[in-house]
Amino acid sequence: MSRKGPSKKHVVLPDPIYGSTVVAQLINKILLDGKKSIAEDIVYSALDMVKEKSDQEPVAVLKRALDNIRPSLEVRSRRVGGATYQVPVEVKPNRANTLSLRWLTDFSRARREKTMAERLANEILDASNGLGASVKRREDTHKMAEANKAFAHYRW
């Protein structure tokens, strides 16, 4: 462990168009090979598509989608006496945000639409309505935690 104290958290500055740190974090998750301008184009065009399709504020739809994806429980492996148990633990808020953004981008990339902006927009819309692969991932995570509730006393 570090003797210098806890590591400093990286502060993400809000994006220039919507003034939202959530959008800035999404841009950073979409980012590949350091091409930030391309990532910004993808996210902003996806949010424009969300606005066209839903007639609602795109940042509000994105936040609702992330709330639907955000896990509250997960399982972590704990080795006890030669056996490895899947122990359910609560997810810290920072990790929950990171997981929801990661799942949103990963399952957007796995979709079948033609452009990444379309995939991201449709995944955001699906997640805001409680559908889509990213919401299913959260449900599966919660089911795993529920199934292993018997090992909750091993948590640390």
UniProtKB/Swiss-Prot annotation:
Question: What cellular component terms from Gene Ontology apply here?
Answer: small ribosomal subunit
> Which GO BP terms, alphabetically?
translation
Q: Does the keyword tRNA-binding apply?
A: yes
Which pairs of Cys residues are joined through disulfide bonds in the record?
Answer: none
- The superkingdom listed in its UniProt entry is Bacteria
- Subunit notes for this chain? Part of the 30S ribosomal subunit. Contacts proteins S9 and S11.
Protein name (Swiss-Prot/TrEMBL): Small ribosomal subunit protein uS7
UniProt source species: Bifidobacterium longum (strain NCC 2705)
